[in-house]
Amino acid sequence: MPDLFDPLTLRGVTFANRIGVSPMCMYCAGDDGKPTDWHLAHLLQRAIGGAGMVMAEATAITADGRITPGDLGLWEDGQIAGHARLAAAIAHAGAVPAIQLGHAGRKASRLPAWHEGPADPGWEVVSASDQPVGHFAAPRALTEAEVAAIPALFAASARRAVAAGYRLIEIHAAHGYLLHQFLSPIANRRNDRWGGDFDGRARLTLEVVQAVRAALPAEIPLSLRVSHTDWIEGGWTTAETVELARRAKVAGVDIVDVSSGGIDPQRQKIPVAPLYQVPGAVAVREGTGVAVAAVGLITEPEQAQALVTEGKADMVLLARALLRDPYWPMRAAVALGRAGAVKAPPQYDRGWNGIGKFGMRFETGAPFPPL
C-alpha cells in the first residue's frame, strides 16, 4: 500500500504526496469576483507548507451563485487573469493548483460567516424547489429551461479554470448548495425530469459532470465533492452516494471528495468526532473502485497516514488543521519518519533543515538542552 507521502497520479497530473488543502471560502473577493492579495497569500503559504494539492475556494459559475458578495467567480473571461496569478504561485511552490466550482442555490446572497445575515444589497436566490431552509431567504424554483442551462455554465467556468492554469477541477455537489439541493429529497420537490426518483434527482449533477469532462483536456483530472449523507431521516443517503459515484466515474470523474451534511443545518444530527466522515469515503471506494479523498476532523499525522496505508482513501484533505498550521505537511513528514519527503523552499531552509537531526524537538524546533 502507498503511504501519505507517496505520489499520486490522476490522468496526466502527479501530486507529490496525498495531502490536499480543502477549498475554504475567504469571503474577501471584490464585487467583481476577482481574487485579492489575501487569496494569494493564503494559498501560497499552504503550498509552501508542503501540501501536494492546494484547492482554491468554492468559485461561483454565475454572479448569483455566490454564497456572499465576497466570493470568487469564474463566470466571465475577465476573471481569468487573477486566477492565473493564484495558480502560478501554487505551482511555483510545488503543489498542484486546483479549484472548486459551484453554485450556492438557496444558500446564496449572505454576509460572511463572521457577520451572519443576508447580503445588503442582495439578490434573488434559486433552488430545485421553493423550499426555504433555516434563516436563508425563500428561493424561487428554477424553470426547466434554467436547469437545462446549468451544465453549460459549469463547463464554461471549467474552461476558464484550465486557461488560468488549474490542474484539477472539482464540481461542488455537497454541503447544501445547488447541486446537492437537486440530489436531496429534502430540498428537491420537483415532479419533472429533474426531480422525483433517484434518476431524476441525480440527473443535473451527472449532466454537469458530463459537460465539464467534455470541456476539459484529457490530461486534467475531474473531482466531484459530495455529501454522502444528509444526516436527516428521509434525506440523501450513503447508498445513493455510492450509486451517484458509480455513474460519475463512468462519466469521467477521477476522484470523489466525500464529505457530508449541509442540506438543512438546523435539522441535521451529525455525530461529530475524529474521522466521522471516513465511512462515507470507504463506502464509495469499496462500492465503485473510484479514487476517493477523505475529509473531516483529520488532525493528526498518524490518522492521515492510516487512511492511506489501510486503503480507506487515496488522498486526505485538510481544512481547519491547515488554517491553524500551514506547515502541517512538513511537521507530519517529520513525525512519520519521512522528513525528506517534503522540501522547504531555499528561503525557508534554515528553519527546517535541522528538524529531526541533532536532537531538535519537533514541536518547537528548539534543541534539547545538553545533558
Q: Which sequence ranges carry the predicted segments?
A:
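Flavin-dependent oxidoreductase catalytic cores
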Residues: 1-371
